C-alpha cells in the first residue's frame, strides 16, 4: 500500500532539520557555484568543509564514523545541495550515493572497519568505476578483466574505465571487472576495492572537459597488470552486476532529490521575475502563458518531491525491490527539470540569456541528469519490461487455453487469444484508492479508473505483440511514461491525504 505517506519519527525529523539547516548555511557561505563552474574545480576547502559537517558520511553507520542517518534525510540534504550547485551535488553523489555505497551495503565488517572511517569523514574520497568505452548503458558489457594470480592470493586487473566522476582524485574506487567462470564463456562481473597506489593503476585524464557539471573531476583511468588482493573483493565473486545495479538505485534517488532542489530554485526565480518585470503595462505574472509555465513547474516539482521521498522511505523500510520506483523518479525528475530550466530562462527572457545570471549554467548542469545513472531512454524500456514480466505471467495460462481452442489454426489462435485478453481486461475491477478526505473523492475515482485502464491496455498490448513487444520501443516508452505518471499521481495523492488529515507533511 502507498498509504499512509511516510513520515520521519520525531527524533529523526529533528536530526534531519538540523542537518538541512547546517548544509544550507554551509552552501550559502562557502560554495560559489559560478566560481566552481568557471574554474572547473571544487576547491579542497569546500570538500573538507562538507566532510566536517558530516555530509560525506551521512548514512554511514556511526560505528564506522558516519552520522547514521536515513536515506530519507540524506535526500533532504542532497535537495539543498542540488538547489545550490549542480557540480557539488554530483560530487557528493559520486562519493556517497554510489562511491562508498557498495562498501556500505556489501562490505564485510573487516572491510568496513578498514576503509569506511576516512571515507565517511571526507579524509578520503570514493568513486564508482563501472563505465567503459564499450560499457555505458549496457552495463553488462564490461571488458575490464580480473584473472586470479597463480598463487591464488589475488587478481590481476587489466582494462580501462572512462567518464568516472572522482575517478582521478579518489582514494578508493569500486571497480567492476570480469572474472573467469567455467559456466559462462565470457565470465561474470565482480566488484573490487582499488586504490591508486596499486602498481599498474594509471590516471590517463583526471579532469575531462564537459558541457556542464564542470566542477567535478570526471576522469579516465587505466589498469595494467594491476594486482588486487582477494580481500578487496566486494560481495561475492561473479555477483558484481547485481551489486552495481543495486548501488545505482540509491544514486537515482539522490539524483531526483537534487533535481527537486534545482527545480525549487528555478521556480523561486520564475515567480520573482514574473512579479517584478513589466511589459505592455502589466507584470509578466498577469499573463496566462507565464502563469501556465509557473503552474506546470510547481506541479511537477511537487510530484517529483512527493515521489522521491516516498521512494527514499521505501528504501529505508528494507523493501527487497525498488528498482522500478527509482527508475521512474529519476526519469520524471530529470525530464521535468530540463523543461523547468528552459521555462525559467524563457520567463527571464533576454536577461536570462547572459552569464551574469545562473540559468545557462543550470541548463548545462541539468542536461547530465537525463544521461547519468542510467540514460532515460534505457530506463523507459526497463520500466516497461518489468511490467511486461508481471502481466505476461498472468497471460501465459490464457495463451495455453487459446491454443487448445484454436486447434492449430494460427489465424484463429491470434483472434481467440486477443479476444480472451480483451474480455479478461474488461472484467478487471478498478483498484480501490482509499478516500480519507472528502476533498479527494473525485481524484480517488479518477486515479482508480486510470490505473485500471492502464492495466487493460498492458494486457492487450502483450496479447497483440507477444514476444515481439521487446522490440517495440515506441510502445515501451509510451507505457513507461503512463506508468510513471500514475506512480507520481499516486505519491501526490498519498501525500495530499496526509496533509489534509493532519497537516504535518
Sequence positions of predicted segments:
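Amphipathic, small/basic residue-rich leader segments at the start of a protein or domain
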Residues: 1-94, 101, 105-114, 118-125, ...
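Alpha-helix capping/hinge segments and adjacent helical runs
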Residues: 25-26, 54, 164, 213-214, ...
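Short Pro/Gly-enriched beta-strand edge/turn motifs at strand-loop
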Residues: 124-130, 201-206
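Short Gly/Pro-enriched turn/cap motifs at secondary-structure boundaries
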Residues: 134-137, 163-166, 182-183, 210-217
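A structural signal for short hydrophobic beta-strand segments in well-ordered beta-sheet cores
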Residues: 144-148
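A short core secondary-structure module
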Residues: 154, 158-203
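Glycine-rich beta->alpha junctions and the first turn(s) of the following alpha-helix
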Residues: 203-302, 368-369, 385-391, 400-487
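C-terminal helix-coil-helix/basic helical segment that borders enzyme active sites and/or dimer interfaces
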Residues: 275, 279, 302-332, 345-348, ...
Amino acid at each position: 500500500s502507498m498509504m499512509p505517506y511516510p513520515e520521519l519519527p520525531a527524533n529523526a525529523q529533528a536530526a534531519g532539520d538540523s542537518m538541512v539547516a547546517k548544509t544550507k548555511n554551509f552552501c550559502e557561505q562557502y560554495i560559489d557555484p559560478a566560481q566552481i563552474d568557471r574554474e572547473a574545480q571544487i576547491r579542497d576547502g569546500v570538500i573538507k568543509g562538507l566532510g566536517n559537517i558530516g555530509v560525506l558520511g551521512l548514512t554511514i553507520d556511526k560505528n564506522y564514523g558516519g552520522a547514521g542517518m536515513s536515506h530519507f534525510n540524506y535526500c533532504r540534504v542532497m535537495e539543498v545541495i542540488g538547489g545550490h550547485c549542480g557540480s557539488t551535488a554530483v560530487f557528493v553523489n559520486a562519493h556517497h550515493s554510489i562511491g562508498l555505497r557498495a562498501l556500505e551495503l556489501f562490505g564485510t565488517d573487516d572491510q568496513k572497519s578498514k576503509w569506511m572511517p576516512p571515507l565517511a569523514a571526507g579524509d578520503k574520497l570514493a568513486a564508482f568505476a563501472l563505465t567503459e568505452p564499450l560499457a555505458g548503458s549496457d552495463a553488462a558489457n564490461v571488458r575490464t578483466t580480473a584473472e586470479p594470480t597463480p598463487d591464488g592470493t589475488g587478481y590481476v586487473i587489466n582494462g580501462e574505465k572512462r567518464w568516472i566522476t572522482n575517478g582521478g582524485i579518489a582514494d578508493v574506487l569500486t571497480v567492476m571487472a570480469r572474472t573467469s567462470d567455467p559456466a559462462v564463456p565470457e565470465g561474470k562481473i565482480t566488484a573490487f576495492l582499488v586504490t591508486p597506489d596499486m602498481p599498474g593503476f594509471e590516471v590517463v585524464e583526471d579532469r575531462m572537459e564537459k558541457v556542464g557539471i564542470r566542477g567535478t573531476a570526471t576522469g579516465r583511468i587505466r589498469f595494467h597488470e594491476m594486482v588486487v588482493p582477494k580481500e578487496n573483493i566486494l560481495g561475492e565473486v561473479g555477483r558484481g552486476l547485481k551489486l552495481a545495479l543495486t548501488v545505482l538505485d540509491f544514486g537515482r534517488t539522490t539524483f531526483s532529490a537534487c533535481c527537486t532542489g534545482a527545480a525549487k530554485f528555478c521556480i523561486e526565480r520564475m515567480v520573482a521575475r514574473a512579479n517584478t518585470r513589466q511589459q505592455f503595462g502589466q507584470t509578466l505574472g498577469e499573463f496566462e502563458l507565464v502563469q501556465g509555465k509557473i503552474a506546470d513547474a510547481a506541479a511537477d516539482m511537487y510530484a517529483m518531491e512527493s515521489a522521491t521521498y516516498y521512494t527514499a522511505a521505501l528504501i529505508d523500510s528494507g523493501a527487497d525491490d525498488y528498482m522500478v520506483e527509482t527508475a521512474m523518479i529519476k526519469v520524471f525528475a530529470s525530464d521535468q527539470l530540463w523543461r523547468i530550466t528552459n521555462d525559467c530562462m524563457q520567463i527571464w527572457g533576454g536577461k536570462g540569456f547572459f552569464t551574469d545570471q545562473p540559468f545557462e549554467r543550470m541548463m548545462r548542469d541539468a542536461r547530465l541528469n537525463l544521461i547519468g545513472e542510467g540514460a532515460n531512454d534505457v530506463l523507459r524500456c526497463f520500466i516497461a519490461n518489468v511490467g511486461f514480466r508481471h502481466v505476461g505471467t498472468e497471460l501465459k495460462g490464457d495463451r495455453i487455453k487459446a491454443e487448445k481452442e484454436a486447434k492449430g489454426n494460427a489465424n484463429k489462435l491470434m483472434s481467440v487469444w486477443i479476444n480472451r485478453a480483451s474480455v479478461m481486461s474488461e472484467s478487471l475491477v478498478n483498484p480501490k484508492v482509499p478516500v480519507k478526505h472528502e476533498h479527494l473523492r473525485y481524484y480517488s475515482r479518477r486515479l482508480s479508473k486510470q490505473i485500471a485502464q492502464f492495466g487493460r491496455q498492458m494486457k492487450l498490448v502483450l496479447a497483440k505483440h507477444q514476444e515481439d513487444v521487446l522490440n517495440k520501443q515506441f510502445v515501451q516508452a509510451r507505457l513507461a511514461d503512463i506508468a510513471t505518471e500514475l506512480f507520481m499521481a499516486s505519491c501526490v495523492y498519498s501525500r495530499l491525504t496526509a496533509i489534509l488529515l493532519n497537516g504535518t507533511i
